[in-house]
């Protein structure tokens, strides 16, 4: 059941009706049943992996909640996390490993062609975050297995996030949620806006992108147009999906974390990752970046670098290394291919180098008499960041790192948009002349609507609240 499917809409409708009528006293139990039904509808065999991750982290959490010596606690959390990520690693990265072994050693090991369960990365990270919070005593372990199972499997977010935190999500499943029209209206607003972004904006941009990059050597002068369209497609599809997910949760009175906050208004790559896939970024910060930065070996490295490079640079270098390692992991998380590793390193290196050059940037701005708070400089930062982000999308679009680099070269050396206007890019599409104009119009209008709403939100205006204050017949 895709988020835009008719079946999904019927599933939600029946779920909401039952939630506020028949199951008013046991709502969380209905949500658990709905979550497992939804997941099983994709492939019932995948429920095994969902249950395995749930059982491992639930059991370890209950054990960690007891009084015991530090070494034993560390062994338990390490073992549970190893098993947790072993499932993810084997299913997601085995064929990638086999392929590289075959390439390096000229081997002929057969691919296992394992099917990756939907949402595995999301619920693995979510359950691992819960376990680490219990280990660090930031939260108490959930003793009720079925309530914990609902936290891991909550169906709106299981496929594409946001990655939930136990202390903010689990308690919302407790008690009785009364029917509130405000939740229904806000939920429907988010769902409709998300569907608009996915179906009007992303789907039309995707067809355009596919025509260019499936024949990128033929249309090598259209890389710029293609990557701009891809930035629209990716944002529309991903943020639109999150809007639908959050909207569905609102219908049940459950508020999920925000996952996108006007990312294309970011003024740096660091700022971009504070706005794009926010819950992945905060997960990496809390459970990877801080543990690495505060580790013993990083402390030793910091002392050595301070002696060699001075106090300021010496303190910054370990942080830069930690950022690069974090984004290497972000790349690996995105997929089992070298292009995703390159994508992660690209972001990590830019953030790391930016950290090292912070003092130099400040000096340059003073010498050039640039006012950091001026509108002109703010706009320059947004454009610069947007360019850097779009370069990173080349690694996501391409099949290989080499292909991404060739596209990058074409981006700056070749510029030929004539196939857009003479129709040759759509030569294989019946009635392409009408199709071309309808598609361009949909992308243009969709982008304008999303840009306007994003601009209002960037200014601090609550568009949803304003819309809800308008009489229904005027909307």
Can you say where each PLM-predicted feature lies in the sequence?
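Membrane-embedded transmembrane alpha-helical bundles that form the catalytic cores
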Residues: 1-451, 457-475
